[in-house]
């Protein structure tokens, strides 16, 4: 069974709802052969990444940057993953109170260094929280799981 790993920092109930929606989409009844799991950014490690076939990375925008928790994940795991996870398919989910540009740029820079492959346009949910963010997050989870199941990624 293939594994889709969601690594995220969800400090607010709304962001947690978005992560839950990603999991709901990824674990849809339409998908067989893919296990989707969530590990908080402060708990995830290189072994978790090495067991995964694809990743979704989620973060709020904090002062125009990713959360400290997701940055900590990369600080701890960048070099242990560097040469063992080249071309890892991944997607980005950003909950941005502003525009998310700085957060996206920082994540893309790190992912480029790791040589991971962003396989979906980053989902940046901007401005005040809207219920439509939940549906968008669920679609992201479904897309990643279906793509993994089909061998597209």
What is the predicted function of each stretch?
Residues 2-27:
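N-terminal beta1-alpha1 ligand-phosphate binding loop
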Residues 7, 39-41, 121:
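Conserved beta-strand termini and adjacent loop/short-helix elements that scaffold enzyme active sites
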Residues 10-13, 94-99, 124-130:
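Short histidine/acidic/glycine/proline-rich micro-motifs that form metal-
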Residues 13-17, 65, 101-102, 132:
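Residues that form or flank phosphate/diphosphate-binding pockets in enzymes
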Residues 26-33, 82-84:
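Short helix-capping segments at alpha-helix termini
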Residues 27-30, 45, 117-153:
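Glycine-rich phosphate/pyrophosphate-binding loop and the adjoining helix
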Residues 32-43:
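A short beta-strand-loop structural module common to alpha/beta enzyme folds
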Residues 41-118:
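Helix-loop-strand module that forms the ligand-binding subsite of alpha/beta enzymes
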């Amino acid at each position: 069974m293939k594994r889709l790993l969601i690594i995220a920092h969800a400090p607010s109930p709304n962001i947690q709802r978005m992560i839950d929606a990603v999991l709901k989409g990824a674990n849809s009844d339409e998908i067989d052969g893919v296990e989707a799991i969530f590990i908080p950014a402060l708990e995830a490690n290189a072994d978790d990444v090495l067991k995964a076939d694809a990743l979704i990375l989620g973060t709020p925008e904090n002062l125009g940057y990713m959360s400290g928790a997701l940055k900590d994940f990369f600080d701890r795991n960048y070099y242990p993953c560097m040469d063992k996870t080249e071309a890892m398919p991944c997607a980005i989910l950003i909950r941005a109170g502003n525009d998310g540009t700085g957060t996206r740029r920082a994540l893309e820079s790190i992912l480029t260094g790791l040589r991971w492959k962003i396989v979906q346009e980053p989902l940046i949910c901007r401005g005040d929280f809207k219920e439509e963010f939940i549906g968008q997050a669920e679609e992201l989870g479904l897309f990643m799981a279906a793509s993994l199941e089909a061998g597209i990624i």
